[in-house]
Amino acid sequence: MLTTTKVVIGDMMRELVYYVAVSIDGYIAAPDGSYDAFPVEGDHMAVYLSDFADALPAHVLAALDMHPPGNRFDTVIQGRASYDISRAAGIERPYAHLSEFVATRSKTTPPAGVTFTADALTTVRELKQQEGLAIYLCGGGNLAGELLPEIDRLILKRNPVVLGDGVRLFGNAGAVVQ
């Protein structure tokens, strides 16, 4: 059975929320970055669709004939590897209903509506000072490790899956944050 753990780590007006599926051994993806070991059907989907629909990619919302409620997130930040999964599937703006930021050092020009940032920490700090809803930290683990001091809320979708290896929840972050 899937369980959800909510941990509040701060009291900011605009939060950075790391909402992520995780195996019971602490991995958010397989070594190749795939996440198909995590179930997409089951009781947890009711919570996802009712409380976290803003965190669904735009193409998934369209397939479900849903409109994003716009009541939880208005911005998403993700790492380049996470973003490239969508790009490989031909999806230029996976979260077209949100302001999209991608942490990357690439000098390529992003598609319209997507902002590339080489300094995710500064970008998140600036976003948190602006009016708006919460900021969805979509992944991956290395970006989460980099942004760990700024994460205000951690929502783990713990899955009864053991991956044994892969992308860790906070990448290779070694710092202790309380």
Give the residues covered by each predicted segment.
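Enzymes that bind and transform nitrogen-containing heteroaromatic metabolites
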Residues: 2-178
